[in-house]
Regions:
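Acidic, surface-exposed loops and disordered segments
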Residues: 1-115
Length: 115
């Protein structure tokens, strides 16, 4: 199962979440799911939480579809929502980090403002 291959840090995360859409192959819905993830990730970081994507399960849905196999992974994922019209399209882990991540380099705000 895909969860067994997750990194040790992810396995200890107390939250496994997902973002679901009505049609995981609709471009507008996928873009909106990405925006939701960006906002949730920024909010989590601001509150001292760590979050990381874990889309192996969703990628397996695409893999089965590309190979014209029965949608067994899609059926498993769809059961997570309890609503057959909601399809998980983005999976993530979230929790409090054991170690602080190094800060990513940032330019000063003045360097990126348009005037």
């Amino acid at each position: 199962m895909w969860r067994c291959r997750a990194s040790p840090g992810a396995q200890s995360a107390p939250l496994l979440g997902f973002i679901a859409v009505r049609d995981r192959y609709d471009q507008a819905q996928c873009l909106q799911a990405g925006r939701i993830w960006q906002r949730a990730h920024l909010l989590a970081t601001a509150r001292g939480l760590a979050a990381r994507p874990s889309n192996e399960a969703v990628e397996m849905v695409d893999h089965e579809r590309a190979l014209a196999r029965p949608p067994s992974r899609a059926a498993l994922l769809d059961r997570l929502t309890g609503d057959p019209s909601c399809q998980p399209t983005f999976v993530f882990y979230m929790g409090y980090p054991k170690h602080a991540a190094p800060a990513s380099p940032r330019r000063p705000v003045e360097a990126v403002l348009l005037r």
